[in-house]
Every structure is written in structure tokens, then in C-alpha cells.
Amino acid sequence: MVFIFMFLFAFSVFPQTCRQLAKEVKPTLSPETRKAYDVKLAEAFDQFTKQGGNADSTIWLGRRTAYLGNYKDAIRIFSEGLSRYPTDARFFRHRGHRYITIRCFDEAIRDLDRAASLVKSKPDQVEPDGLPNERNVPTSTLQTNIYYHLGLAHYLKGEFDPAYAAFMQAFNIAKNADMQVAAANWVFMSAMRLGKSKEAAQFIGKIPDNLDLIENADYYKLIRLYQGKMKPEDLLKEAASNATIGYGLGNWYLYNGRREETMKIFRQIVAGDQWASFGYIAAEAELKR
């Protein structure tokens, strides 16, 4: 009886963390993709062992673990890395991303704020892609990813002022069109939520036509929608199976007073299978507000 009391008392004194309570939904992967990811994870573990768990090998082990949907395990790996490399901003950046994935937004903000402070006044660095694009050209950097994910975490909490500031920082330091387009999409949406429709229109209107993009065509389509160069009907079919397009289109309806259509699209997104995508997480957050 005493043991039971002490056990229950311990749980009352030490409540479970968001990570412990969070849901984890693994992605739907084809057998071929899963096999390829498993091979890459095995290679990452082999490098981790051979290199004595140095910073680079630990980060790759965490990233490869997350690609298979083991987000909490990835967070634990990044946390272990931080215990050995507490001033390496990359660990806070990647752990912050995966806290967003499991909907622990406060934890994500703390990590990403810390990452931002660690890279302040330092040169930026290209971030290698774990899932290379068709040109095998990385499109993001450590600092753009820190501010981009920080903006997302604030946005998902409905904190649009700091979201706007973080996305604008990501946009301003972006070194290529792909990252600029991704950040610009969220700058626009944050500004619209703040009631800055004139400022949002002026900003998004400056994004040029015919950009040479490698991987962010979806965000570019949404920008063209906001610019009035595409119609919502042009994206409806794609929105049914693409959470990124769906969330942007739902917001366009919201900005134009068509709330019923907005909610319909958001519900359609969360009925799908893109649980870890930012469009899905954002639609889910909207429906809970």
C-alpha cells in the first residue's frame, strides 16, 4: 500500500511532459521507400558508432530516425546530443522541428529561440538535405530553418506577431528562391491574420513571376493565388490530396469571407494521411481554436 501511494505521489509531483503525452503517427510509406529509409538509418547508426557519437553523426541519426516516423526517439537522440554539445545550435533546430511535429509548440519555441541566440552574428551555413531534391541541391540553411520553424511554432499557437517577425527574418536571410518563396507564403498569411492586408498585398506582390524553383512549387502556386494570378478553382483538385495547397487555399477562402469553405477544406486535410506536414498541423490547430 505504501509503495502504491509513493508511486501515485511521484506522478502527482512530476507530471508527464508534452513529449510523453503527445501522439505520434507514422507516415504512410511504400515498401520501397521504407526499405530505403531503413538502409539510411542503419548507415547513420554505423557512422554514429564509428565516429564515437560526434555531433554530425548524432544529428544524422536523429534525422534518419525521424524520417521513419519515430519522432519521440529522434527528440531523445537530439537531447542526448545536447548533453554533449550544448552550444551546437543544430540540435536545438532539429529538436525544435520535431517538437512541432508532435504538437509541443512551447517546447519548440524554447528550442528555436535558443538556436537563434546561438547563431546570432555568426556566418550562416548550408544545411544538407536528408531527402535530396531532383537536382541534389540543398535549398535551406541553418539560420533560415531556425527562423522558419520558429515562425511556424508561433503561428500554430496563434501568436501571429512573433510569427510574422520570424518568417520575415527567414525571408530576408534566404539565399535562394525556394526558401524565399516558402518564407514569403507564411509572411503573407501571418500579416493577413494581423489585419495587415494592405502590407501583405504589397509584400506578396513583389514576388516575381517565372522563378526557377527546385522543390517549393506548391508555395509558389499559393503566392500566385494571393497575387490574383491563379483562381481558387485551379487548386481545388490538388488541395484534396495536398495539405500544403489545401491549407493555403483554405486561408484564401478565409481572407475572402468564405468561412464555410475554409472549414470544409481544413476538415478535409485532417481527414487525410499527411499528419506530419505543416499544412496538416496548421489545419488541425485552426479547428481546435
Regions found by a protein language model. Give the residues of each.
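N-terminal leader/linker segments that initiate helical-solenoid repeat arrays
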Residues: V13-W60, Y67-L68
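Residue-level recognition of tetratricopeptide repeat
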Residues: R63, H97, L152, M189-M192, ...
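Short coil turns that delineate tetratricopeptide repeat
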Residues: G52, P86, K120, T141, ...
